């Protein structure tokens, strides 16, 4: 739930391991 992945996922996917897409940013926990 924290936007600490430093990645956006406007396309719907995250490349960073352990991160999920909470549009439009990738989040972890």
Swiss-Prot record:
There is a cross-link at residues 1-29 (Cyclopeptide (Gly-Asp)). Belongs to the cyclotide family. Moebius subfamily. Pfam families: Cyclotide. This is a cyclic peptide. GO terms for biological process: defense response. It comes from Oldenlandia affinis. The keyword Disulfide bond applies. Disulfide bonds join 5-19, 9-21, 14-26. Transmembrane segments: none annotated. The presence of a 'disulfide through disulfide knot' structurally defines this protein as a knottin. The keyword Signal does not apply. This is Kalata-B4. Probably participates in a plant defense mechanism. Keywords: Disulfide bond, Knottin, Plant defense.
